[in-house]
Amino acid sequence: MLAKRIIPCLDVKDGKTVKGINFINFRDAGDAVELGRQYSKQGADELVYLDIIASHEERKTFIELVKKVAANINIPFTVGGGINEMQDVDRLLNAGADKISVNSAALRNPSLIEDIAKNFGSQVCVVAIDAKLEADGQWLCYLNGGRIPTNQYLFKWANEVESRGAGEILFTSITHDGVKNGYANEVLSALTGSLHIPIIASGGAGKQEHFRDAFIIGKADAALAASVFHFGEMNIKVLKNYLWRKGISIRN
């Protein structure tokens, strides 16, 4: 069995890490490079940096940040936010990123997934899917950080993403994001059962048991979290020791 991964996520605005609830109400969580360095020392397997503004000016700041992160940490990291074309991918990989996460741009232009996989390899292409459980019981995909509903449903889109060559999927439940009541394990389990690429669980981590459940019930390959790490509620080394004691294959 492949070891499960613990991945802190850093949402970046003006070079600072911020965190919100249900994708709104952001608060400052600290320096993005320093936090990344701390997580690397604590034993994080990977990091994800998301540029949540992604304006033209912010893009320059973000590329400089990616260079600093690459110079200061020794674990793989994924970057996303505002990636719309191959030129953006090229710039960020050249700045030192290991993987690229695309979300809204892939929904608008699915061939971007194939282009990234073909030019840089599937392992570089992470497709982020933000979905919300609707009143009719369906999981609907959203654009622009959870603000704009689409006509795409989660399972249909996830299967298309895999068929177009994505290396893994980062699935965030908007319904669960930031409220710390656990991951969307039922839908995670259905996703992992229907796909052949790794699924990263995101949205809902509040305590150690939530990570355990994401791996055992949700069958996720990795679990991503933000606020529990940023605000010192949970130490990654302590979390990994807990998971290991629960019989979960984890890198120490």
UniProtKB/Swiss-Prot annotation:
GO molecular function: imidazoleglycerol-phosphate synthase activity; lyase activity
Family: Belongs to the HisA/HisF family.
Subunit structure: Heterodimer of HisH and HisF.
Pathway assignment: Amino-acid biosynthesis; L-histidine biosynthesis; L-histidine from 5-phospho-alpha-D-ribose 1-diphosphate: step 5/9
Active-site residues annotated for this sequence: D11, D130
Disulfide bonds: none
Reactions performed catalytically: 5-[(5-phospho-1-deoxy-D-ribulos-1-ylimino)methylamino]-1-(5-phospho-beta-D-ribosyl)imidazole-4-carboxamide + L-glutamine = D-erythro-1-(imidazol-4-yl)glycerol 3-phosphate + 5-amino-1-(5-phospho-beta-D-ribosyl)imidazole-4-carboxamide + L-glutamate + H(+)
Annotated keywords: Amino-acid biosynthesis, Cytoplasm, Histidine biosynthesis, Lyase
Record's protein name: Imidazole glycerol phosphate synthase subunit HisF
Signal peptide: none
Cellular component GO terms held in the UniProt record: cytoplasm
GO terms for biological process, alphabetical: L-histidine biosynthetic process
Biological classification of the source: Bacteria, Pseudomonadati, Bacteroidota, Bacteroidia, Bacteroidales
UniProt source species: Azobacteroides pseudotrichonymphae genomovar. CFP2
Transmembrane segments: none
Function: IGPS catalyzes the conversion of PRFAR and glutamine to IGP, AICAR and glutamate. The HisF subunit catalyzes the cyclization activity that produces IGP and AICAR from PRFAR using the ammonia provided by the HisH subunit.
UniProt-listed Enzyme Commission number(s): 4.3.2.10
Principal EC category: lyase
Annotated compartments: Cytoplasm
